[in-house]
Amino acid sequence: MIVHLLRHAKTEVFSNTGKDFDRKLAPKGHQQCLELKVLLSKVMGEETNIFSSSARRTRETAQFIFDEQKEILFFDELYLSGKNDLMTFISNREEAKEILMIGHNFGISELASYYAGKQILLKTGGFVSIDFPDFSVNELSASIGIIKANHRCTIDY
């Protein structure tokens, strides 16, 4: 089992509606997506299941990276989810062998830290790939993951 975790790209500070859920990507976020597109094309398998929060910033991150080349499933419950909710979501994907989850801090970083057994702080556009050789989606637990890739966008702020 491989779990890829991606924090959404850089966003504008405020949305036109005043709602956090509606914040869109900033120009630097678009540049980060171009960088991530190259990286993810190299580290993700063809059959990767892609799940994303339905917030505007995660939706835009996913769509900029994958265009319409991959199926992306969006879920309201992934918006600002904590580690435990993310773990439950992943464990319910019994058929998956490889997952990419696009989400938010602090939950996405907490999940990465839990699986890898060390502190991982994903900045905007941050990505980590964690491998669980010989483990199924229902067997994932603390500190058993092996970090295969850890990327921080060169366009950070």
Walk through the language-model features, giving the residues of each.
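A polyampholytic, Gly/Pro-enriched intrinsically disordered region
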Residues: N92-N105, S143-C153
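Domain-level recognition of soluble alpha/beta enzyme cores
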Residues: K118-K148
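Short alpha-helix plus adjacent loop in nuclease-associated cores
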Residues: L80-I90
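Short aromatic-enriched loop/helix-cap "lid" or pocket-rim segments at secondary-structure transitions
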Residues: N16-G18, L86, L140-A142
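Active-site catalytic microenvironments for nucleophilic, acid-base chemistry
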Residues: L39, F64, E68, N92, ...
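Non-DNA-binding regulatory cores of transcription-related proteins
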Residues: R93-L100, F106-G125
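Active-site-proximal alpha-helix that buttresses catalytic centers in soluble enzyme cores
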Residues: I2-E77, S81, I108, Q119-G125
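Active-site donor-binding loop signature of nucleotide-sugar glycosyltransferases
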Residues: H8, E77, F132, R152-C153
